[in-house]
């Protein structure tokens, strides 16, 4: 499938180009500027808009319940963020077209006013909205939000879809051709440690989906996960070790596209295993260099979703928050 240009803009010394398959290119004069040059505004904003989730984890009794490893603690009693307030904040921030917003939760498509928000930000303001959903919410069998998701993708309200999977539904998702055909930017979300390395490898390497995209996420040892037994955590830690020991071979053998969040890069020690030229040209930088995190349920912000240090959003703009995050990114916990 041929790439189509979604956005191109200048952010301080950096030229940013984004294509419809999710490819992002950042270019600057590295002889004149640092490896993480200071920008005028954030290029990608991770925004939690809800803590509501009906329950998307299939337990041993065959029932759906809340995910036991959810660091957000999302549940059927979780609260929603105010999307009108978020949209107003985006407008006041005077951001150029093409800024990426990674919208998550909880279940983001259950948030009141979500369609109006997407129409405003994706269509009227031409921002790039990426949404993360649990596959059980959008599966062809009983996924309550499947048609809504497909409709939003076809209408361009969502440009990228991240799909969280587990061992019991990964194969079903890999065979979901209807969903795969809707967009060239559908990404499988895999949590290392939680998901078995060998199960993931077997399913991915033997599926018919050509060049699947995978985002490997670092396991977060807090939130609901922190309440699990030490025995369960020990089992997951062994899985993390297996991921760490085999990740380089996985990258060499996999015929798709693999990316990592910064936590996974750290926990699996990925950067030290890669050639310098690969790191120099493909590593997108640390959290806070051109990104930021908002919890719009609690109306707080931080450097990243795992940040313990949070500050109230108040009446700040995205530009003001980014400046604060960037200037304090090295000491921000």
Feature map (PLM): residue ranges:
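Flexible mid-to-C-terminal extensions adjoining Fe-S/redox cofactors in radical SAM and related proteins
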Residues: 2-17, 21, 38-43, 293-333
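Canonical Radical SAM [4Fe-4S] cluster-binding loop centered on the CxxxCxxC motif
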Residues: 33-85, 305
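Core AdoMet radical
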Residues: 44, 52, 71-83, 96-111, ...
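Short, flexible/disordered intra-domain loops and linkers
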Residues: 56-62, 139-144, 224-238
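Alpha-helical scaffolding segments of alpha/beta enzyme cores, especially the outer helices
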Residues: 88, 113-123, 148-151, 202-203, ...
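Catalytic domains of carbohydrate-active enzymes, especially glycoside hydrolases
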Residues: 88-98
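Radical SAM enzyme [4Fe-4S]-AdoMet core and its adjacent flexible, acidic
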Residues: 159-319
